[in-house]
Design a protein with these regions (language model features):
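Short His-Asn-centered micro-motif
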Residues: 140-144, 192-194
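Conserved NAD+-utilizing ADP-ribose enzyme module
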Residues: 172-296
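Solvent-exposed loop/turn segments at secondary-structure junctions
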Residues: 118, 145-148, 196-199
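Bacterial N-terminal signal peptides
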Residues: 11-21
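Short active-site loop/helix that positions an aromatic residue
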Residues: 144-168
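Bacterial N-terminal signal peptides that target proteins for export
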Residues: 2-11
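ADP-ribose/NAD+-binding catalytic cleft of ART/PARP-like enzymes
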Residues: 31-141
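Boundary at the C-terminal end of the N-terminal hydrophobic targeting segment
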Residues: 26-29
Length: 296
C-alpha cells in the first residue's frame, strides 16, 4: 500500500486491485485536484457517516462532484453497447465450473449466490438456514466472485477518507451502483438459489455459458424483462440512472479499462403472486465479508 503521508488525497479510484482474481490492473486515474485534506486529529473528532453519499457530501463535496461527472459519462457510455464490449469470460453457472459452488437438492440444481443489501436486523430479516420467499426482482453474483474482489482490494493509504468508506465506494462502482443517499448497503447475503429460477439479464438469458449476445437498442418487446431493466436504467421518474449495458456483467465505473467489466450478474424475477424460494446460508457485514483471513 502506498504511503502518501500528508499529500492531497489522490483519488478514491486510484488503487491497485486484482480483477476477477486473475492479474493486476493498471492504476485508475487520480482526482488529486478535487479533494480536501482531513488529518487524523480532525478525523478522530468527526462523526463519520456510514454512507458513501453522506460522507462525500459532508467532507469531500468536490470529490463527490467529480465522481458524479464520471458516473454520468459512464451512464452515457453504457447506454449504447458496442460489439467490442461483448466478452467471452462470464462466470457460467454449471457443475462443470470449478469456481462456483453448487449442490443438488431434492433433485434440483442449486447455486450459491450473493447479493449486497441493506439489512437492519439480520437474525430476523435473513435467518440462517431458513427458507425464504422472495417476491421481488433480486440481483446476484455467483459466490465467490465479489468476495474475492473485495478481499484483494487495497485501500489508498490516505488521511482524507476512512478505509471503510473507500471500500463501500469501490464496491458500488464494481457492482454498477450509483451514488445516492438511499444506496447504503450493509451486508452480503449468500443463499442457495434454484437453477430454474435464475437468468442472466441479457438478450439471451442462459446462465450456463460464458457470453451474452450484443444487446439491441431499442430492446425488442419479445424480451420484456430485459426491456424493463433497460428502460428503468435510463428513463425513470426519479431521474436516477444506472450504467447498464445488458452484456452479462456489471458496468464497473471505477475501472478505467474498457469494457469496464465487473462481475457476472444474474437475477431472479418473481412476483408477489409467484415468489421464489431460497435458502439463506450467511448474512455477513460488508467489512467482515471483505476481510482476507488467510488460513495458516
Amino acid at each position: 500500500m502506498k504511503n502518501w503521508q500528508h499529500k492531497f488525497f489522490v483519488g478514491l479510484l486510484c488503487c491497485t486491485f486484482l480483477f476477477f482474481g486473475w492479474e493486476n490492473q493498471v492504476l485508475a486515474a487520480g482526482i488529486t485536484n478535487y479533494s480536501t485534506p482531513i488529518f487524523p486529529s480532525q478525523l478522530a473528532q468527526l462523526q463519520v457517516p456510514q454512507n458513501v453519499y453522506d460522507y462525500l457530501q459532508q467532507y469531500q463535496p468536490e470529490t463527490y462532484n467529480y465522481l458524479t461527472e464520471k458516473l454520468a459519462a459512464s451512464i452515457e457510455d453504457a447506454k449504447e453497447p458496442l460489439p467490442d464490449e461483448v466478452v467471452n469470460d462470464l462466470w457460467a453457472l454449471s457443475p462443470n465450473n470449478p469456481r462456483i459452488k453448487w449442490r443438488e437438492n431434492n433433485g434440483k440444481l442449486e447455486y450459491l449466490m450473493s447479493t449486497w443489501k441493506y439489512v437492519s436486523n439480520p437474525s430476523t430479516d435473513w435467518p440462517i438456514g431458513a427458507k425464504k420467499l422472495l417476491p421481488y426482482q433480486t440481483w446476484f453474483t455467483a459466490v465467490p466472485q465479489v468476495k474475492e474482489f473485495c478481499q484483494q482490494y487495497q485501500a489508498v493509504d490516505s488521511n482524507n477518507i476512512p478505509d471503510h468508506i473507500e471500500l463501500l465506494l469501490r464496491l458500488q462502482q464494481y457492482l454498477g451502483l450509483i451514488l445516492n443517499k438511499y444506496s447504503t448497503k450493509t451486508h452480503f447475503v449468500e443463499m442457495w438459489v434454484k437453477e430454474e429460477d435464475l437468468m442472466r439479464p441479457c438478450i439471451d438469458g442462459e446462465i450456463n455459458d460464458s457470453s451474452c449476445n450484443l444487446l439491441p437498442v431499442p430492446v425488442p418487446d419479445t424480451n420484456p424483462v430485459v426491456k424493463t431493466i433497460y428502460t428503468n436504467s435510463y428513463t425513470n421518474a426519479k431521474k436516477e440512472y444506472y450504467p447498464w449495458s445488458g452484456l452479462g456483467y456489471t458496468y464497473d465505473w471505477g475501472n478505467p479499462e474498457k469494457p469496464h467489466q465487473g462481475p457476472s450478474e444474474f437475477i431472479i424475477n418473481p412476483t408477489p403472486e409467484k415468489p421464489v424460494e431460497v435458502e439463506v446460508v450467511s448474512v455477513t457485514p460488508t467489512q467482515e465479508y471483505c476481510q482476507n483471513n488467510v488460513e495458516q
